[in-house]
Each structure stands twice: as C-alpha cells, then as structure tokens.
From Swiss-Prot:
Function: Catalyzes a mechanistically unusual reaction, the ATP-dependent insertion of CO2 between the N7 and N8 nitrogen atoms of 7,8-diaminopelargonic acid (DAPA, also called 7,8-diammoniononanoate) to form a ureido ring.
Official protein name in the record: ATP-dependent dethiobiotin synthetase BioD
Pathway connected to this protein: Cofactor biosynthesis; biotin biosynthesis; biotin from 7,8-diaminononanoate: step 1/2
NCBIfam families: bioD
GO-annotated biological processes: biotin biosynthetic process
Active site per database record: K36
Gene Ontology MF terms in the entry: ATP binding; dethiobiotin synthase activity; magnesium ion binding
Swiss-Prot/TrEMBL keywords: ATP-binding, Biotin biosynthesis, Cytoplasm, Ligase, Magnesium, Metal-binding, Nucleotide-binding
UniProt-annotated binding residues for substrate: T40
Gene that produces this protein: bioD
Known cofactor(s): Mg(2+)
Keyword ATP-binding on entry: yes
Length: 223
C-alpha cells in the first residue's frame, strides 16, 4: 500500500507526521519504508534535512528514501531548471517504487510542499503533485495546521483533492495543543467538510496517534 503524505503548505509538519506514522505502523508489525522522491535544500556535505531525520531516527538510508535531490530550497520544478543536468524520468520513479513494494508492506511517500506544488515543467504542461499522487498512491494523509487560518487552509485543500478526484484521504491537525482556537478550528473544519479531523501534539511519539486514525490508514477508507 502506498500512502502519500501531503499538507496545506510547506513547513506544515509532513516529515514530523511521517516519522511517527512510520514508527506507529512498525510497532504494529508492518514492514514500512519512507520515500521522498523530491528533496530540495542541501544542508552541506550532501545532506538534506528530511532525509537526515529518516536516516537518524528511522534508520533508513538515502538509497531507500531518496531519488532526486537538489541544492537550493525551491519548488522541485524550479530546482530542475536550476540543475539542468537532472531530468525527470517517470519510469525510474515507478521502478523505484516497484522495487520498494517488493520489500515492504507500506510505503510512506512524502511530498514536497503542499498539494498543488509543480514538480516538473514540460514544454506544454506541468507535472504536478496531484499527478504524482495519481501515479503512485492508494491513500493520502493530509497534514493541517492548528493555528489561525487552519479553517481556510483545510477547506481549500479538501476541495482541491475532491476536484482532482484523488484517492481517499484522512486529515490530521499537527502541533495541536487543545487551545480554545484550536478546538474551534477542529470542530468547524469537521462540520464544513464533513470529515473527521485527527490531531497530533507537539511532543508526539508513535503512541500519540489514535487507534481510529491508524485503522483509517490501514483500511484506506475515506470519511
């Protein structure tokens, strides 16, 4: 099963959620890996922030987690333009995933930035994150902010997913502290989009996910 982890924006906590989801699924006996096909922003010595987290905290090497890496902290489509020696090879990406599927029960695919990020610009169209999801994934984990603005972000995000006819998704509000505004954000989002929203606190562990959230992912259901 391929699970795509995306969010309403960049720096929303996708890596944080992915890391603990990986650990939570592992403790339940699943063979799990993480794959981030497009990683920007080198931090020196051929190292990249998210890939370093997966290496140091999940014991997953770069040869498992990465495919395309770029020096500058920019959108993948611009990174490809800057580093012109790199070209998107769709078949290489699919082959990498097929190789991982032969070894693991579940693959957590972390996207770059939010749901509408362009990945590669061809002469007549863009290859978008939504195309990547359609090509690779069975289910989506949508990471939401808990702060002011979360309601608008969540509604736009969900409407876009529905409009693009993407696979089923589950929503999780990151860095949730149970403050009055966060409680209202959670309640209002659920009423407006007619879906359950799960939460993950700032000081999380693999035990922090509710069993209902894990079962939703394992079952791959919408709602």
């Amino acid at each position: 099963m391929n699970i795509f982890v995306t969010g309403t924006n960049t720096d929303i906590g996708k890596t944080y959620v992915t890391k603990y989801l990986y650990k939570a699924l592992r403790t339940r006996g699943y063979r799990v890996c993480i794959f981030k096909p497009f990683q920007t922003e080198e931090i020196g010595g051929g190292r990249y922030p998210d890939l370093e987290i997966y290496k140091n905290e999940c014991d997953l090497d770069y040869d498992v987690t990465s495919l395309y890496t770029f020096k500058d902290p920019v959108s993948p489509h611009l990174a490809f333009k800057i580093e012109r020696h790199q070209q998107l090879n769709h078949q290489t990406m699919i082959d990498k995933l097929e190789s991982l599927k032969a070894q693991f029960d579940m693959i957590l695919i972390e996207g770059a930035g939010g749901i509408a990020v362009p990945i590669y610009e061809y002469s007549d169209h863009f290859y978008m994150t939504t195309d990547l999801i359609k090509d690779t994934s069975d289910f989506i984990v949508s990471v939401l902010p808990s702060k002011l603005g979360a309601i608008n972000d969540a509604i736009v995000h969900q409407k876009y997913i529905d409009h693009q006819e993407l696979p089923p998704n589950v929503l999780i509000m990151n860095n949730y502290t149970d403050s009055a505004i966060e409680q209202d954000n959670l309640h209002t989002i659920e009423k407006l989009i007619h879906k359950s929203v799960y939460t993950l606190g700032h000081q999380a562990t693999q035990e922090s996910f509710s069993e209902a959230f894990i079962q939703r992912i394992i079952g791959g259901s919408n709602g």
